[in-house]
Amino acid sequence: MIELFSADGWLNQAIVSVNYFTWTYILVAGLVICALWFTWRTRFVQFRMIGEMVRLLGDSTGTHDEGEKHVSSFQAFAVSIASRVGTGNLAGVATAIAIGGPGAVFWMWVIALLGSATAFIESTLAQLYKRRHADSFIGGPAYYILHGMHCKWMAKLFAVLITMTFCMAYISIQSNTICGAMQKAFSIDPTWMGGALAILSLAIVFGGIQRIAKVSSVLVPMMAVSYVLLALVIIVMNIQLIPHVFRLIVENAFGFEQVAGGGLGATMMNGIKRGLFSNEAGEGSAPNIAATASTTHPVKQGLIQSLGVFTDTLLVCSCTAFIIIISGLYVNNSESGILLTQVALESEVGAAGPIFIAIAIFFFAFSSIIGNYYYGEANVRFLTQKPSAILALRVITGGVMVMFGAIASLDLVWSIGDFFMALITICNLVAILTLGKYAFRLLDDYRQQKRAGVKSPIFKRETMPDIEKDIECWGQ
């Protein structure tokens, strides 16, 4: 059984073959084309309105009935960042550099800069088509596919795929990374670590979205700031190498300096793959939490989630990239993933490096497990309201898949993640390309209100009479 889960097992080899075709011939082109279109059509919203994005983090929740529990704009931002800022930032970046060289970082930056416009579109649509659920809101791609495109089978397909992606594949990756880091730093057996992690995960996921939001809003800023500060210290210590680092990134990005992974193709492919895993722009994940926010206009969450892409890739991912490239250990090194990040940091700060990374990755990846679970729960609730289904999801997510990630090989869990990531992204891109025109109209409405002097724009569904019947919220 363990051999089946190994890097050389037939399961991993089969998935790798499928991933190569899907990513090479479909997904990379689709992501770039969509990102360029949304960037152009929104008139570069991700750059022109970055000041508004930051201001909206302090935006108060929209008006609601007394006793209702709604997620604030900042909490929605924190939960989505909790999912984005995780293994992809420490282990994913290291894997991309190990295979594609420093140039992979350039393509991660590109997909983040352009993809933030895609993130704006999907999260704005999630807010537009959100539904009331108990004392909060619920929504996401499954909901805008059903109520916007009126395509029931596609909505159900997406709900199933994203649940499998985040609650199975991605949580396995987070667990695998935590266990690997803890084994290197503290010699803790992965099986024991997996068991402890499962207990902690179950305790959180049984608490519901309000507990998830509260935990994430505390953990995420703390872990992100501490990691960025350490990276800045290392960069300052090696300030004379920074021009060389940028030169390596640019030269390798365009194939001027070949790498073991196969030159320009491997560099671009791995940069885009790991960039998407990290920032989730266009993947259809962040809209699930964006829909839960109580706000006065759908565009507000679109802008906030766009900022999340910048924060994830341009800040946190870049920190890992600079640490690894400065160390030079990505060249002819047998280590990959989180272990490469650990040895790179060890070369800069000594034996404390692997220990710090082990602790950091625990908080990064554990918060991602929390965020990933919510994405799954939101979509299971779309499929069925049976309490037994939610109970099963919590047990499988917090128990079974955490343990699977602890014992499976690094290559297998990443291959499975890439496979499901491709499927949900293709499905979501089709949806947002179809419905994007409504996000454009919402953005125009928001800008017009701002130009008219309205400090906090308000959206009413009657301003879009052609689709008013499809919108449940946003009434009087």
Question: Positions of the model-derived regions?
Answer:
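Helix-loop-helix module between adjacent transmembrane segments
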Residues: 34-39, 111-135, 141-176, 180-205, ...
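N-terminal alpha-helical transmembrane segments of multi-pass membrane transport
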Residues: 1-87, 98-103, 433-476
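Transmembrane helix-loop junctions in multi-pass membrane proteins
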Residues: 10, 41-46, 88-93, 102, ...
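Membrane-interface loop-to-helix entry segments
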Residues: 30-54, 176-182, 189-238, 242-250, ...
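Flexible loop linkers connecting adjacent transmembrane helices
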Residues: 44-71, 95-105, 117-149, 330-348, ...
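Alpha-helical membrane segments and immediately flanking helix-loop junctions
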Residues: 64-97, 125-128, 134-142, 146, ...
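Extracellular loop-to-transmembrane helix junctions
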Residues: 16-55, 98-135, 311-319, 419-429
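Extracellular/periplasmic helix-exit of transmembrane alpha-helices
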Residues: 120-129, 134, 232-248, 256, ...
